[in-house]
Amino acid sequence: MQPYQRDFIRFAIDRGVLRFGEFTLKSGRTSPYFFNAGLFNTGSALAELGRCYAAAIVDSKIPFDVLFGPAYKGIPLAATTAVALADQHQLDVPWCFNRKEAKDHGEGGSLVGAPLAGDVLIIDDVITAGTAIREVMQIINAQQAKAAGVLIALNREERGNGELSAIQEVERDFGIPVVSIVSLTQVLEFLADDPQLKQHLPAVEAYRAQYGI
């Protein structure tokens, strides 16, 4: 585990973004942990989150020309990551986002920011069913651009209804890598090393044995 990954898990736990207990997911599964990136909701939290995304981008070595944040949740993520890439890594990267509804006046159309062109790195919080990414792929294709990959905060490493996870389905269907700041593997590693949180390890391991990929 890289230092930025350990920092991210500790930060997510401290912010209440990553919690342990008993949670019913939209899928109907009862999960021993829950991840809610919406709670990175202050200036300092967003700044730290951007630094973690930026570190993951540099670590991934995925070549790209522009960062794209899908509306709505991806917009602040793309913005803070672009700032962190410039501040921490001296990489001045263009970024853009889409509107949910196209405007017909002012800065018209459905895209805002830098031109969506070349190799596009999509940035979002999680991939649950892959539906949002499929919509993004249509936007990118409509601009004659090309997806370089997807970056998310957490990979749950969990099967969907079939044998594959939603992330594996995206990788298979579009032939692009999906990388994450951390995956469940690293969360388990963190729990094993933390005396206070170790009590949650058996439940998370059991859940992984049942639903993991």
Swiss-Prot record:
Pfam families per UniProt:
Pribosyltran (PF00156)
Q: Where does 5-phospho-alpha-D-ribose 1-diphosphate bind?
A: 26, 72-73, 99-100, 103, 105, 124-132
User: What's a GO biological-process term for it?
Assistant: pyrimidine ribonucleoside biosynthetic process
What Gene3D superfamilies has UniProt attached to this entry? Answer: 3.40.50.2020
**What is the enzyme's class at the highest EC level?**
transferase
Where on this chain does orotate bind? 34-35, 128, 156
Instruction: Tell me the InterPro entries matching this sequence.
Output: OPRT, Or_phspho_trans_dom, PRibTrfase_dom, PRTase-like
Question: Where is coiled-coil annotated?
Answer: none
Molecular-function GO terms, alphabetical = magnesium ion binding; orotate phosphoribosyltransferase activity
**Reported cofactor(s):** Mg(2+)
Q: What is its EC number?
A: 2.4.2.10
* Cellular component aspect of the GO annotation: cytoplasm
- Recite the UniProt keywords alphabetically: Glycosyltransferase, Magnesium, Pyrimidine biosynthesis, Transferase
Q: Which PANTHER family match?
A: OROTATE PHOSPHORIBOSYLTRANSFERASE 1-RELATED
Name the protein family: Belongs to the purine/pyrimidine phosphoribosyltransferase family. PyrE subfamily.
Task: Describe, as the record does, how this protein assembles with itself and its partners.
Answer: Homodimer.
The entry's function note states:
Catalyzes the transfer of a ribosyl phosphate group from 5-phosphoribose 1-diphosphate to orotate, leading to the formation of orotidine monophosphate (OMP).
Q: What name does UniProt use for this protein?
A: Orotate phosphoribosyltransferase
> Native species of this protein?
Pseudomonas putida (strain ATCC 47054 / DSM 6125 / CFBP 8728 / NCIMB 11950 / KT2440)
User: Could you tell me the gene encoding this protein?
Assistant: pyrE
